[in-house]
């Protein structure tokens, strides 16, 4: 059912008249990295971005948790020159948790939640110069226990970027109505991502980022801190392969996250 909805979404978006290939903006995928770009895709264009595989390790004094994701998909469709709609869904997640004291292992394999979002660019939708956007989003609790959040959530992201030749600076403040850790109710979370990107050539780019998120969960307030390094390679004007790694900077954060993926514009 969800796959059918994704293809229907793509077909409707593709029905909007598209620009000639030579008139299209430079490719501007959401992947990779911790932050969110301010750019939007051309009206009528469709972009599919897929995290092929990802792994996160979180170790505490009591347990070790390995989380795997496969097919972390994001479908983007340009509605106007400065507005796009997004549909995100993690096709499969697997969580393995081992109790350090007893050695007991719990495994869960589920589909993930669905995310719906709009991105309205307010300045330079192609991402050039100074670019800023507003991005409200909502998550729907389709995912199973241990992989999905268990309830609906929502939030606002405000991506900001500064392009300085081969260098770019990015900031992604956000405020969220996040789902409680027990899956019942919501609380406030907020934070930001800051990063610098560099174009190593016409085809290869890299970015270094830092993310801080304050989570006011009733079960215990935490501050997640991550540092990330990512790279992308564009073999053509409409596609990109990427790889990235994030490292936790404190006890409230996963120890390490690794991922790779692909983006294709149609």
Residue ranges and their predicted role:
Residues 1-28:
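Cleavable N-terminal export/targeting peptides
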Residues 20-266:
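Transmembrane beta-barrel domains of Gram-negative outer membranes and organellar outer membranes
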């Amino acid at each position: 059912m969800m796959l059918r909805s994704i293809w229907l979404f793509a077909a409707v978006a593709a029905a909007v008249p598209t620009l000639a290939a030579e008139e299209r903006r430079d490719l501007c995928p959401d992947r990779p990295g911790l932050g969110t770009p301010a750019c939007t895709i051309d009206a009528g264009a469709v972009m599919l971005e897929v995290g092929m595989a990802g792994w996160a390790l979180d170790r505490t004094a009591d347990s070790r948790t390995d989380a795997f994701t496969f097919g972390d998909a994001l479908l983007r469709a340009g509605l106007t020159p400065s507005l796009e709609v997004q549909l995100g869904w993690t096709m499969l997640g697997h969580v393995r948790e081992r109790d350090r004291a007893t050695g007991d292992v719990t495994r869960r394999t589920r589909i993930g939640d669905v995310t719906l979002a709009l991105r309205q660019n307010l300045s330079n939708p192609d991402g050039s110069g100074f670019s800023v956007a507003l991005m409200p989003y909502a998550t729907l609790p389709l995912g199973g226990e241990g992989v999905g959040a268990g309830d609906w959530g929502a939030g606002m992201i405000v991506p900001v970027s500064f392009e300085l030749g081969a260098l770019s600076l990015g900031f992604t403040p956000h405020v969220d109505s996040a789902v409680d850790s027990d899956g019942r109710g919501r609380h406030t979370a907020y934070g930001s991502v800051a990063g610098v990107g560099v174009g190593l050539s016409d085809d290869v780019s890299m970015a270094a980022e830092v993310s801080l998120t304050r989570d006011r969960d009733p079960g215990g307030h935490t501050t997640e801190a991550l540092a990330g390094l990512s790279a992308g390679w564009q073999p053509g004007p409409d596609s990109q392969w990427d790889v990235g790694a994030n490292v936790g900077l404190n006890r409230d954060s996963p120890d390490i996250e690794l991922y790779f993926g692909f983006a294709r514009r149609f």
